[in-house]
């Protein structure tokens, strides 16, 4: 789960590619000036991340619930670092963990490692936290503090429980027992005259095992931990830039969907199909998929797009979406446009509706796939079909359908000059 320098440099190259694509497409769209400031900011962030690969100091979050001894532990670590130079490479910050709510997902985005402090068995939120940190390539050490509050048998039992928890993690996490602020020890003294006296004396701090552990884990793995943090940040930057690029592309994609929905409507109106299921092949065609894929950087050949369209149309029929779309549009026509209930009009509007819903679903999927860096060959048409079903359910409001029907009737009714010319 650790990263290396090569992985970071590859990710930085991907950021540069997306930045250049965004710049080129913005210029082509006449929006170069509008993106100049954010483009410059993103380029500066990229350079900063490139340079951060060279840092030697580790950012360590000291995490634990209230009153687990985090502050005292940090003071001891900072004091020890004055005499133990390697520990001075640890830049510590304190984070309080609420057992009920946990912490925000990005709370530890800039941390190279996490030192989790507990005074007993772990809560589920603490276990979830270290599991997520391990999965993100961050270093993790678990410090069992206040061990002086336990008798030897109970101390061993808690330690065993903690080790069992960490054994379930993808990579090993060390557990160390410490006493950062041990309770005073009661000492009884017997005087020569036979009298006794009792005093409380400070017990020795038990932190050496933690100092050794931190040097053996965090500090020994500094290059890999720095690379892992930088890689997370570079990937986050790529998603930010890709989000901006998606926004730029969305206007182009919507314009294409607007055009293709009326092309499909005109085709279905002019040549009604014998069964409504065949509307899927009219509405969801290779041109729609190829054009939208190209907008978002998923370059499919026409043959690949036709095969994909056939798959998506078949899934659409299987899910009953053609029948559903026809039913909702027929209901709207009966209520508001009864004069235009002819079969050709219904099929034309149904084709337009399906094309629009398929187009919006493809746009949504392609945007998320671009954010995730999904290659073209891994595009899931089943996932797109599921999104299409969700889109139809979300966009079944009467007002939206009335607007679509009104536009469609104006285009398809007898005498409308644009009825068939939209396919030009």
Task: Give the residues covered by each predicted segment.
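Hydrophobic alpha-helical transmembrane segments and adjacent short intramembrane/lumenal linkers
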Residues: 294, 298-336, 340-344
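Acidic, carboxylate-rich catalytic segments that either coordinate divalent cations
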Residues: 347, 359-363, 367-424
């Amino acid at each position: 789960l650790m990263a290396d320098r090569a992985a970071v440099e590859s990710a930085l190259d991907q950021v540069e590619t997306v930045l250049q694509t965004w710049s080129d497409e913005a210029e082509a769209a006449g929006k170069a000036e509008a993106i100049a400031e954010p483009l410059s900011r993103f380029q500066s962030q990229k350079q900063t991340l490139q340079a951060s690969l060279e840092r030697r100091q580790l950012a360590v979050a000291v995490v634990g619930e209230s009153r687990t001894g985090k502050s005292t532990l940090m003071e001891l670590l900072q004091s020890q670092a004055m005499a133990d130079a390697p520990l001075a490479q640890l830049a510590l910050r304190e984070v309080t963990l609420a057992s009920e709510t946990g912490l925000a997902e990005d709370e530890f985005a800039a941390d190279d490692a996490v030192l989790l402090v507990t005074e007993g068995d772990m809560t589920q939120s603490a276990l979830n936290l270290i599991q997520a940190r391990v999965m993100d390539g961050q270093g993790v050490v678990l410090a069992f503090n206040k061990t002086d509050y336990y008798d030897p048998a109970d101390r061993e039992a808690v330690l065993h429980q903690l080790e069992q928890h960490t054994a379930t993690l993808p990579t090993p996490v060390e557990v160390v027992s410490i006493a950062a602020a041990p309770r005073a020890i009661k000492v009884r003294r017997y005087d020569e005259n036979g009298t006794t006296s009792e005093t409380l004396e400070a017990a020795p701090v038990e932190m050496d095992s933690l100092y050794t552990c931190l040097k053996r884990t965090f500090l020994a793995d500094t290059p890999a931990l720095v690379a892992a943090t930088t890689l997370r940040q570079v990937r986050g930057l790529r998603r930010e830039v890709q989000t901006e690029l998606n926004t730029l592309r969305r206007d182009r994609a919507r314009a294409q969907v607007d055009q293709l929905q009326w092309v499909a409507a005109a085709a279905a109106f002019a040549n009604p199909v014998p069964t409504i299921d065949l509307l899927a092949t009219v509405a969801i065609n290779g041109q729609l998929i190829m054009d939208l894929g190209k907008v978002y950087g998923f370059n499919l050949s026409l043959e690949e797009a036709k095969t994909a369209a056939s798959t998506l149309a078949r899934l659409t029929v299987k899910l009953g979406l053609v029948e559903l779309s026809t039913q909702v549009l027929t209901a709207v026509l009966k209520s508001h446009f009864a004069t235009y209930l002819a079969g050709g009009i219904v099929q034309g509007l149904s084709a337009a509706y399906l094309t629009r819903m398929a187009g919006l679903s493809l746009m949504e999927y392609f945007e998320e796939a671009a954010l995730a860096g999904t290659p073209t060959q891994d595009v899931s048409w089943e996932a797109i079909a599921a999104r299409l079903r969700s889109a139809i359910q979300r966009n079944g409001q009467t007002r939206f359908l009335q607007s679509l029907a009104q536009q469609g009737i104006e285009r398809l009714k007898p005498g409308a000059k644009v009825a068939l010319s939209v396919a030009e």
